[in-house]
Amino acid sequence: MILYFHGFDATSPGNHEKMRQLQFVDPDVRLISYSTLHPKYDMQYLLNEVSRQLTQSDDPAPLAIGVGLGGYWAERIGFLNGLKTVMINPNLHPEDNMLGKIDRPEEYADIASKCVSQFREKHKGRGMCILSRQDEVHDNQAVASILAPFYPIVWDEEQRHKFPSLAAHLAEIKAFKEQQ
């Protein structure tokens, strides 16, 4: 089972396309949707929703995958649920770069301060990060410098921030999911 966390643009048709592509990794791909506007409520909702999805699956190695803001959530919710995680162009600091787009960006800082201390160290080896060199939204060199001590970084030379085509990385994602 793959739990797919969409990015900030929740209604983008690209989400359906990415989920369709991920079916080459695992036929059971489930959308984990959230409001994108109210982070404090999203955190509790996502924890409950992922827990519910996990009880409805017999997959011994479910995978959380998120793009952009979904990468932020996939990393945290994946860690808290003991899931392997793939982050694609993750937004690591929505409290800084979502000003004017969401109602309470400061809630992301609050969530970060309440998350398990040094959670990346504790999640080391259970995540993988795919970063685009053509990301027009985030400085992925900075993202890589933060995440590289904890997760392998896979660079993509062509995709933009929303990463419409996962095709070049599906084999890597599948191998990561199946790796013990």
UniProtKB/Swiss-Prot annotation:
Domain of life: Bacteria
Pfam families: UPF0227
Disulfide bonds: none
Family, per entry: Belongs to the UPF0227 family.
Protein name in the entry: UPF0227 protein Shew_1627
